[in-house]
A protein has these predicted regions:
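Metal- and O2-centered redox machinery and metal/ROS homeostasis
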Residues: 1-97
Length: 97
């Protein structure tokens, strides 16, 4: 039986791609860690958890420059990341913009 592959526009997939970009960025990575109170090991351990993805999208929604830079880096529009935040947010306890 073939398993369904997640769509590249799936909100969790977009959030994971954004997280990978932010974590690897010299400016955004440390700032995100400082705001969440996590260290790099904790982030690695919690990377796929809904609350971590929501925290990352909340972080990006609060900083337009980082939102635009991240969207460009992962090949999506800022609006697609905002939509991912809206889709993950209400169901998982995040913001509903």
């Amino acid at each position: 039986m073939l398993r369904d592959r997640p769509s590249p526009t799936d909100p969790a997939v977009l959030a994971l791609q954004a997280l990978a970009h932010v974590a690897g960025d010299d400016a955004m990575g440390p700032r995100f860690l400082a705001l969440t109170g996590m260290d790099a090991d904790a982030l690695r351990a919690k990377a796929g958890k809904p609350e971590t993805l929501i925290a990352l999208l909340d972080y990006l929604m609060a900083n337009e420059h980082d939102l635009v830079a991240t969207a460009e880096a992962i090949g999506v529009t800022p609006e697609q990341l905002a939509m991912a935040a809206r889709k993950l947010g209400p169901d998982m306890g995040g913001n509903d913009w």
